[in-house]
Amino acid sequence: MAVKMKKPDYWPTLEEGERLAGIQRERDAKRRSIINKEDCIRIRGANEHNLKNLTLEIPRNELVVLTGLSGSGKSSLAFDTIYAEGQRRYMESLSSYARQFLGQMEKPDVEKIEGLSPAISIDQKSTNRNPRSTVGTVTEIYDYFRLLYARIGIPHCPNCGREIARQTVDQMVDRIMELPERTRIQILAPVVRGRKGEHQKVIDRARKAGYVRLRIDGNLYDVSEDIKLEKNIKHNIEVIVDRLVVKEGIERRLTDSVENALQLADGLLQVDVVDGELMQFSQSFACPDCGISVPEIEPRSFSFNNPFGACPVCAGLGYRMEFAPELIVPDETRSINEGAIAVLGWQSCMNKGSFANAILQALTEKFGFSMDTPYKDLKPEVKKMLMYGTDQSVDVYYEGQRGKGVYPVTFDGLIRNTEQRYRETASDTMKAEYESFMRITPCGTCGGKRLRKESLAVTVGGIDIYDLTCMSIRTLQDFLDNLELTTTQQKIGHQVLKEIKARVGFLIDVGLDYLTLARATATLSGGEAQRIRLATQIGSGLVGVCYILDEPSIGLHQRDNDKLLRTLKNLRDLWNTVIVVEHDEDTMLAADYIVDIGPGAGSHGGQVVAQGTAEEIMAVPESITGQYLSGKKAIPVPEDRREPTGWIKVRGARVNNLKNIDVEIPLGIMTVVTGVSGSGKSSLVNEILYKHLAKTLNRARTIAGEHDGIDGLENLDKVIAIDQSPIGRTPRSNPATYTGVFDMIRALFAGTPDAKAKGYSKGRFSFNVKGGRCEACGGDGILKIEMHFLPDVYVPCEVCHGKRYNRETLEVRYKGKNIYDVLDMTVEEAVTFFENVPSIRRKIQTLYDVGLGYVKLGQPSTELSGGEAQRIKLATELSRKSTGKTIYILDEPTTGLHFEDVAKLNVILHQLVEGGNTVVVIEHNLDVIKTADYIIDMGPEGGDGGGTVVAAGTPEEVAKVHSSYTGYYVNKMLERDKARGDR
């Protein structure tokens, strides 16, 4: 089934790659020879989290990798010790006035750190979820484009598309005189437009010039008044220059007034037509055919975050949230009486005696349909009436507690009624529930382009600014390189274009050439967001800084890893110290220095197992990392690949960059979907496959991406997506509550003789409800103290001393431990503690099996990484009884995992398959890819160059497809493993 394509011309040969690597090694050796060997960061007595009085030296101005098992203490050393101390020292050098705006970091638990530079952290947790944030805005490239379009853009008429030029005073007067005779008008000079401040000088200037009236924010003021404006609010101020009635003979006076207004407002003029629309004129631009004037072009005219540039309907978002008929009635095979209507407020319509049922009964009599008819069989006009209402009044017979009667009702429709309920509710929970019945649709006015039509009518090189931001970064670079400008435009835009090209180049260098500037940052993966910030830092050109990165290779295909490594080395070559928390083998081999933290996780970690170059790490037998790097340990390739038990077929997939493709996915085995970043993996698996299956099998309220359908679902009964989203949003959520084992533990405590004697139920042992919890802190265990210009301080509750429960509850013990002691246990400790309680031990054992032995049962969800959250979800699924017809979907589950952890994860994934289930994984990790039963490789490139299936088959089959980047690296991996004798 492998699909062969032409091999790309630019694909480097193995010999060429070795030659380039040799050149780089020579450069690195030369650079290291001039570095002062004594120049290092000296850390003494680090005890943050699980670090055990750790002492080590890290060379400065080098690329240093911190590695080790998950939970071994890498992040505690890198972020909670080195970064925290570097940031704290820098902030302490500032004044107390400045610190009140910046906050102050707590001193880490470390005895001493020497040789530390100001530190910059580039992690994955600070992705901006604001819908107004895009790749263009966070990289500031869009700001430069706004400036470019404002300075050299060519305006066109938004109505007819004709290129427009500046207006003269005579043209403005002629246009005003075309108004009907006797029309009353005001000549206004817009001196302030949407700017904050008190604007006292502007008001005084108008007063001194002899003008009598001002219009401020739509209200009229006499200049003799004492006008005070709020300085933190944006204001609009217009000077009323003249009031006129259109008639013959006013041309001279009108001309004088227009000239005065233009002089006051720097070439701008507004004519307020009484009982008509406001007319705007500019000495800058106007269409000679349509008579339409375009406001002065400024950088803010192209900002969708500014009212002067944003579409007035969607306020610059580019979309609207609206209730979707297909979510309000998710299953059209049901009748109304069978619960077809799922939206809140109408779920009771099947219950006789409810007012909703009475309304629908009246509608059935009026429009002649039955509530027992499947919704799909209702007439189109009936469906339309149910959704959007009717102007015809219906008589509703209703018998309630206060009596019975007939009430005339005009039915607004399910959608309008639900919209009203959504607007009126003050509950965030209810709003979130209503929003689950909504879908995102492009704004009907701007078509999703976010800007005013006047702004979209300005072009550079024949392209408007929105279409420019929709180009992939690679296409954008080609456009800029071939952009033809006039001599004047070139002179004006030269410096701006230089800055844009540099930033675009940095994005390409970190492997993000498939992204567009219009891409919302909320849709980026953690790795993509981190690499964007990395590109921004390179552009800053800082020297002598300590950069700390958290797995920048996440989500990056092996093909693009070399680009990332070159970027990290460029950052280092600027004489910066680059510390990377990483598990990627290529990054470790390319590093100047490696620190292996371990030997285990949690309480078994926190020590330096080995440090030095990659070769020196490999020589340390105690280093698990070294054993994997040297090949002494490896994840074995299966002897045999499983055969599919069936197939499902996705037809006509065309969401995002997918090219209307058909894709067959095998059942009963483990399938890995691969491809370079942006090739269409997530579009296929998350947007189409998961959402379609969730709606069809799980009856979820989801709308799948564009496709024709999916065949073969009769072999499945449910779909489960195991992603890296948090298991909870508050500290009250923890692994014990998420897996459900805490209910069992509370029941166990309630069954102890002491609890029975006191009449305690299992609710007594919950920290979420009154009774057993400490009421002084509400069961939180901590209290927040506001410190004004210092950051808020969290201190243990003085009553319960951080134990969350009251004294009486803590007196109840099981095997000598109270409920707090159990929550404070690590998973590893709890497995032994509950060994004689099979139901509890089984659930905790699955947490241990997925490599979470170091995590505490009561560890707040807010302290868990995305990878840890995903493994907790995996463990929860493993602890449930399998139906054998489940399809599990995972998106890069190896994020944050060491070689040893990946080996454990592989065992878990194959256990799910052994239970008769199907596992579909989006993954770049070659150790997972090589052990899969089947590979679907997307590509060949990212963005517009992707969206097709390049290869499909077993790893051995895909390895033979020369056009597959994944196949190239899988082949190298299989050949290497074969040479090492792993098979």
Predicted regions and their residues:
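Conserved phosphate-binding elements of NTP-dependent enzyme cores
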Residues: M1-R983
